[in-house]
Amino acid sequence: MDFPNLVLSAKNSIQNVDSKDEKQKIIDQLISDIRGQNDGVIPDEVLSEIQQVAEINGLSFNYEKPVKQELLEQPDPTSVLSQEVFQIRTILSKTLFVDVEAEDYSVYIPDETSNLSPVQIDARPIQTYQPKALMYKDTAILPSNRDEVSDQYGADEILFDSHMFNDISQAQIRDFETYVLDKAMQIQSSLPNLDFVSSLDKEVNPFNVHNTLCLNFGQREYYNIIADRTNQSFQQRRQSVQFDNVVVDGVARRARVSLRLHPFDSQLLDIIRFNTIQDQPLADTMAEYQLVAADGFVATPRFRTDRDARLIADVRSRVMARLCELSPYFHRTRILSSMTDFNSLWKVNVFSSSIDNAKDAIYRMAEISFTVADATTSALSSVNIASAQQTLLVLLNMSLFRFEIEPVGSQSNFGAAVSAALMLVVFPTDEASMSNVTFDNLCNLVFNELIAWTVDRPTFVKRTGMTNAFEANVNIGGGNMTRDITAYMRFVLLRRPWAVFQRTYDDQYVADIMVPNIDEANVNDQSYMAINNLFSGLIQAAQRNPNPGRQIAATSFRKLLKSMKDSCCNRIMPLIRLMKYNVERIARIYRFFPYTADLVQRIPAFRDERIRIKVPVSGMLSIALGINKSPDVFDWYNLLRFADVIRTKNFAERQSLESIMVQALIRNDINPARSRKEYIQQNIKPATNVVASITKVPSATFTTILSDRMLNNEIRRTQSYIVVNRIRDAVRAAFEHVPTAEHGIAKGALLLPYPQNFQRSSVYVRKDNILYNAPVGVDRFSLDDLLNGRFYQGMVNRIQNMSPFVIAGPLQVRASNASAIDSVTSAYLTMSSPYDACVKPEDLRHNRIVQPPIVDFFSDSSITRPNTQFEQLMSKTSVFVIDAPKLIVQSDATVYNFDYRDIQLTTSVVDKLEFTSVKTPDVTLFNGMLVFED
């Protein structure tokens, strides 16, 4: 099939006709011919050429590649796999865990879903840049002023075209700034984002075989045009091309390339350095990873890294940080997402499959027979593995995050009371970490279930001003209230906070890492002593009291206490070591953490906005009874992969959130009546659940958030905002300096009270009504002012006084050809009428211009028309269109300097490292202490 020849002949036919309809017919015929000969499919090698022809001439061309749909076989309708099943999704809620003691569970079926669209990091080096101004050949016309002598064609010249502005419509003229913004966003989406060249399309210079030509950046078209040596017009250009060359410096990794570019393209190439993907050296991060993994692993690079190997930067969006401060819901969603990420990292497999053996041993020691159905057998009923694991995860997460805990589960039995007594020692009880209500409830539970009955005191009931049982009873001595019990109560009432393990380096992004302020080696640490004191005091009091247990027989109660003392006092230290083991290792990747900030220090009101997590009351006792082995050793490969994932996630979240915020902000700056909120909600493409959650913020709240001055300032500091604004400036400047009348848009118009003869704006036309500069001394009116009713009376006054004036601003033009003027049609009538019939009655009623006026544009470039006196008489116009001159492609090339190297950008570091395990047989802390000793 000879498709290229078909396209070539269609190109020539399109150039030979003037009207847009004829051109469209030719291209439609071409497409139908090709599809008819090729089973309805357009081959790829021809498709790009047709698209280019259509784009240059402003023609419409839509083609979708056919997709083959094949169904191999029908699924089995009886199969379990093909039946409809519920998909249970994780929900964003303030409650993180399911209550393990509840008898019935809830399954959440989502009533709405949010579609996530991952951010594609598309690496585009400089040579992928597609020039916006293409080149074409035009021929000068030498007009004749005698009827018997026809016009002649003169020398050829190569010009830049302006097809990049062939998509402005009447609606976009009214809102020209938005059109410029859309154009800038469109350019930014395809603008190179790597500030170097990775390859060049080169060819031997035919005019100087010692040099090389670069065919990228649309230069191939230029060299094709001047290659015709029979065309003497380009002799000078061919001599200049002898000096075109590509010089590559392999040591400095630079390339010097000779190019001829439109100033607009040159400006966009300068903007590329602001649009680059933010990156950092790969070698530095690899060295950091190797140091982190040095605990039990040896990480060696798989291959040597080049000096230009880069890694996407670990960027933390300032816009997201400010949004978290403004919206507690967004902050909680982000914290919850981070917490979910962390849960899989902790090493908590320290329990055997069941605690029943430990419970049986305790029951046997207490001589409790299972045939007796009394409250004794339910004393430890709520102790189980699920509670232990859940509580352990909460404890570990508390070291990285700050949240509120809510004790749940049965709070009226012996096991819950013992567990609460341990919680008061291990958990942080200071006001900043635990609310007063939770603290009081735990203290009251311990007092009422364990202490009051044993020491023969009345149970405590909350009253106004006296809510804590320990405060009420700590100073009342005598009776069976021994010093040991009082010592425990005093210790708890100190409300000791956890110790700081590592201070935050940025309190807007991460919180301090905290650990229990309990020694992991010294058995005489006051926390262990406090628990010991409590049990010693209780055992002593129970021996003197004939009925010490509230619901349990006296002998069983005393024996239960003794066995509890052994279990609890001995198992708290392994728990503290286990926490230290986890925290000190995860803290090594502190620099790569996800968002864990606690904003209470910055905004005190956020104290009530923390996530609330349910903790089983019996959890601490479950841990104490269940912990019976060492955890797994840390796998640094997974931990460092986690760091890679978080880096990529931060990058994607920043990209997807900031780009939409910038567009919404600029649209609102252009027209403050436009809603930023609606634009964001309709157009956001969330990369993660966190970004998607912004659309769930209530409407009025979201409006308030978006009006925050600090948030808007952060948006204005983003890379995306800077790039879009620079491209907008370049597009505006390009519009002012390229000819656009041929695409139906002019820069302005000079309106006259009486017709004048046509003039000739350039050597490429016989005559037209284009002016490059408005005459000096003529009043100018801005279209924007007139649309808003400013200075409209002044314009009417000029018309009444028969004075010429200029309307400056993008105006739509109505193209008229020469035959329409000849035949005295409406085009002739409007062009020769005063002011081009500019003033409409509707405008006078509104006292402003309601619709931007459409002015007539006439251009005659046909040399076949004779220069008759009749034509001279008719060719007058009262409107002159203001446009820019055509830009000639420079003869001598400009030398551009680019970095020249391979694309070595990566998102993952662990793939470049090889991990060799050299772990010791025992799991130890960094100070060499065993985590679990039998």
Curated annotation (Swiss-Prot):
One of its GO terms (cellular component) is T=2 icosahedral viral capsid. It is found in: Virion. The keyword RNA-binding applies. Keywords: Capsid protein, Inner capsid protein, RNA-binding, T=2 icosahedral capsid protein, Virion. GO terms for molecular function: RNA binding. The keyword Nucleus does not apply. Inner capsid protein that self-assembles to form an icosahedral capsid with a T=2 symmetry, which consists of 120 copies of VP2, with channels at each of its five-fold vertices. This capsid constitutes the innermost concentric layer of the viral mature particle. It encapsidates the polymerase VP1, the capping enzyme VP3 and the genomic dsRNA, thereby defining the core. Homodecamer; each decamer is made up of two conformers of VP2, called VP2A and VP2B. Interacts with a VP1-VP3 complex. Interacts with the intermediate capsid protein VP6. Interacts with NSP5. Interacts (via N-terminus) with NSP2. Belongs to the rotavirus VP2 family. This is Inner capsid protein VP2. It comes from Rotavirus B (isolate RVB/Rat/United States/IDIR/1984/G1P[X]).
